[in-house]
């Protein structure tokens, strides 16, 4: 027990002196007025535009870089577009039902043909708007 205390204190004192010392000793260098070479000279020689474009390319990369992850993103985009496009089937069925009801109504009462036709066009516009909205969602899922 006592030996571990002595060993621990000795290790602590050695580590404290090692931390305080620099890892590498650099000889003192006299700078003259004739040479103004600095460690940043290589960076100064580079074009700023090339540095900026390099950092932009780094920041524009996605958070994942594997090919499998990239393929999974593409597959999920296509699946999302496909499932959203199924709604276009509903729009087609809705338009068919609107005009089927128009034909049925005109067959029952031919005198209301003009008024029923205006209602049918209004219903067609509403159903078509839903279909176009669905198409927009599908394209947004694919291209974003």
UniProtKB/Swiss-Prot annotation:
This protein's superkingdom? Eukaryota
**UniProt-listed InterPro entries:** ATP_synth_F0_csu, ATP_synth_F0_csu_DDCD_BS, ATP_synth_F0_csu_sf, ATPase_proteolipid_c-like_dom, F/V-ATP_Csub_sf
Q: Which PROSITE patterns match?
A: ATPASE_C (PS00605)
Q: Where is the transit peptide?
A: 1-63
Q: What is its main location?
A: mitochondrion
A Gene Ontology cellular-component term: mitochondrial membrane
Per the record, membrane topology reads: Multi-pass membrane protein
PANTHER family with a match to the protein in the record: ATP SYNTHASE LIPID-BINDING PROTEIN, MITOCHONDRIAL (PTHR10031), ATP SYNTHASE SUBUNIT 9, MITOCHONDRIAL (PTHR10031:SF13)
* Protein function: Mitochondrial membrane ATP synthase (F(1)F(0) ATP synthase or Complex V) produces ATP from ADP in the presence of a proton gradient across the membrane which is generated by electron transport complexes of the respiratory chain. F-type ATPases consist of two structural domains, F(1) - containing the extramembraneous catalytic core and F(0) - containing the membrane proton channel, linked together by a central stalk and a peripheral stalk. During catalysis, ATP synthesis in the catalytic domain of F(1) is coupled via a rotary mechanism of the central stalk subunits to proton translocation.
Similarity remark: Belongs to the ATPase C chain family.
Assembly mode: F-type ATPases have 2 components, CF(1) - the catalytic core - and CF(0) - the membrane proton channel. CF(1) has five subunits: alpha(3), beta(3), gamma(1), delta(1), epsilon(1). CF(0) has three main subunits: a, b and c.
Q: Please give the name of this protein.
A: ATP synthase subunit 9, mitochondrial
Organism of this sequence: Podospora anserina
């Amino acid at each position: 027990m006592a030996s571990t205390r002595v060993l621990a204190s000795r290790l602590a004192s050695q580590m404290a002196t090692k931390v305080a010392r620099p890892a590498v000793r650099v000889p003192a260098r006299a700078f003259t007025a004739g040479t103004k070479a600095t460690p940043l000279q290589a960076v100064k020689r580079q074009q700023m535009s090339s540095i900026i474009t390099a950092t932009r390319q780094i920041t524009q990369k996605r958070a994942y870089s594997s090919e499998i992850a990239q393929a999974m993103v593409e597959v999920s985009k296509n699946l999302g577009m496909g499932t959203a496009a199924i709604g276009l089937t509903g729009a087609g069925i809705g338009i068919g039902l609107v005009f089927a009801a128009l034909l049925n109504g005109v067959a029952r009462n031919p005198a209301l043909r003009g008024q029923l036709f205006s209602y049918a066009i209004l219903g067609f516009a509403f159903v078509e708007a839903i279909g176009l909205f669905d198409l927009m969602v599908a394209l947004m899922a694919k291209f974003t």
